[in-house]
Amino acid sequence: INYDLERKLRRYAIGNLMKYIVIGQGIVFALMYIWPTLGYRLYSLISLTRAGLMRGQIWRLVTFVFTPPSSSPIFILFALYFYYMIGLGLENQWGKVRFNLYYGVGMLGSIIAALITGYGSNMFLNLSLFFAYAALYPDEQVLLFMFLPIKMKYLALADAALYLYYFIVGGASTRVTIVLCLLNVFLFLGGDIINTIRRESRYWKTRYNFRKAMRK
């Protein structure tokens, strides 16, 4: 994104976007947990479905981002904090305009996938944030399960392998959903991901050659 375009879009960009999204997800989850009848009714009204859109419920084009990423009271705290931190990190690195565009392209991919398959969610949209953060900060450590330190790049590789498996064994709708919902990753981070793979390949090749030379 060039400077002139970024300057024009700056007035429309939402600063600290993930804060509002995480708060919305937290409110929906709290209603589902405390007042299930109202909470699940709200969940059904804000979810992204083709049938709902065809009935003119256009708010679903935006509100689906507020569906909580988990139904577990324990995991939801970790998930919301995690997504807030990586969203904040991306916005600090890119600026609010580029981060808004990245998130917006992910939303658009999710919407197109929903129109094709009948249903969409923010699962892959959230995953795209994780992949972006891992591409920018591959060596940063997080605590897996709150106690096991692991680098972001290894978590990203594990997730990528899992969704590659889903892509291979899943049906056409699964493949369409994965590709479209991760479109922002390919558009914004294709070069960074390729450079990271090349850097890691050179590292492991150098390490292998060094160990091979030491054994002689």
Region annotations inferred by a language model:
Residues 1-216:
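A detector for small-residue-rich transmembrane helices and their helix-helix packing motifs
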